[in-house]
């Protein structure tokens, strides 16, 4: 369905405010709409507006595409007036308010929007696509025209082979890190072919990128962008060597980890893939994966495989607790198999006690204790 709608939701009488349909003008790029819009505020040319930010959606050519190739629709980011439905701004690879030459793959996931100074107005957008790319778009509130929003591709984790044709169907989770001299936004996301959950060819991964450009300005006062990060600039944390009992192995891992732009984990079980957004809480990353059943013969068959839950350190991908209760914290403690079959939904958090929030993965829940120091800081 190439349309978007927004309604006034009253207790008894909800009503549709407007409907947006793709196919012409600036909305030619609007594909199948999969994700929830992000509702926020921006100051556009001195006027504060309620806005709806959405990705361009999905191009169903991705359903059976084994190699990475440009999409016809979906490769856009739209900002609409949330009160009237009018298009305020959009980005794509051409014929847009912000042309980004690398924005050539569809964007079905939710746009992650950051209000860095808690003034109610959005400042940054993080955008992931089905080409395995990640973009950051920066909003300069109060400006207009070409000065209103700038952006760039900041990572490319896809490739041009069947094995490296990684796709992001879901938006990242993002949090600010300020530890001594280290200032960056931690951007966490995982790859997986949602349209073909039973695929076992693509080598999918989970990534945590350190985006330091949001703390640096150029001579014109604009936020900076790192040169596009690829896996070669990331630390492969799969072996859990940073916590090795072997001193030499640990030292080599620490040297390899130093000055990297983040880390990633190979999803090593055959066909394992991420099919939901992660959740960052208390400097830990929760995410789920899906492992297809080996015996299935149809790429479109109902999912009957299993799901796994990961809990890792946001800083380095290490395990953070003794999950299997064997008295040691090692690589095996990153993940646990879920009882539920099929594809697990996104991680949700329920907060009744701020120190012990409950994290739920579908129907299975666990308490996540947040450590607080004597000054009350977590």
What label would you give each PLM region?
Residues 1:
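Glycosyltransferase donor-binding loop in the core domain
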Residues 4, 8-378:
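Beta-propeller fold recognition
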């Amino acid at each position: 369905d190439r349309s978007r709608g927004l309604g006034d939701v009253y207790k008894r009488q909800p009503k549709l405010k407007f409907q947006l349909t793709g196919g012409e003008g600036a909305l030619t790029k609007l594909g199948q709409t999969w994700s929830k819009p992000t509702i926020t505020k921006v100051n556009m040319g001195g006027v504060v507006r309620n806005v709806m930010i959405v990705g361009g959606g999905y191009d169903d050519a991705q359903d059976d595409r084994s190699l990475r190739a440009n999409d016809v629709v979906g490769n856009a980011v739209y900002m609409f007036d949330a009160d009237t439905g009018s298009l305020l701004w959009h980005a794509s690879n051409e014929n847009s308010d912000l042309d980004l030459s690398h924005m050539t793959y569809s964007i079905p996931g939710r746009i992650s929007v950051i209000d860095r100074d808690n003034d109610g107005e959005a400042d940054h957008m993080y955008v992931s696509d089905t080409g395995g790319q990640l973009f950051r778009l920066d909003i300069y509130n109060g400006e207009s025209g070409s000065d209103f929003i700038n952006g760039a591709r900041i990572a490319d984790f896809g490739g041009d082979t069947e094995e490296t044709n990684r796709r992001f169907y879901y938006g990242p989770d993002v949090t600010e890190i300020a530890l001594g001299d280290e200032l960056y936004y931690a951007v966490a996301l995982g790859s997986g072919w949602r349209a073909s959950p039973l695929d076992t060819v693509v080598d999918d991964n989970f990534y945590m990128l350190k985006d330091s450009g949001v703390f640096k300005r150029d001579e014109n006062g604009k936020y900076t962008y790192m040169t596009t990060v690829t896996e070669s600039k990331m630390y492969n944390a799969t072996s859990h060597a940073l916590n090795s009992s072997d001193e030499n192995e640990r030292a080599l891992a620490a040297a390899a980890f130093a000055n990297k732009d983040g880390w990633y984990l190979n999803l090593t079980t055959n066909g394992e893939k991420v099919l939901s957004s992660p959740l960052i809480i208390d400097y830990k990353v929760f995410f789920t994966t899906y492992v297809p059943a080996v015996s299935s013969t149809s790429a479109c068959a109902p999912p009957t495989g299993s799901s796994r839950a990961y809990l890792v350190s946001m800083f380095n991908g290490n395990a953070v607790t003794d999950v299997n209760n064997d008295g040691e914290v090692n690589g095996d403690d990153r993940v646990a198999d879920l009882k539920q079959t099929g594809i697990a939904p996104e991680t949700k958090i329920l907060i009744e006690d701020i120190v012990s929030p409950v994290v739920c993965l579908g129907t299975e829940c666990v308490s996540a204790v947040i450590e607080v120091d004597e000054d009350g800081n977590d």
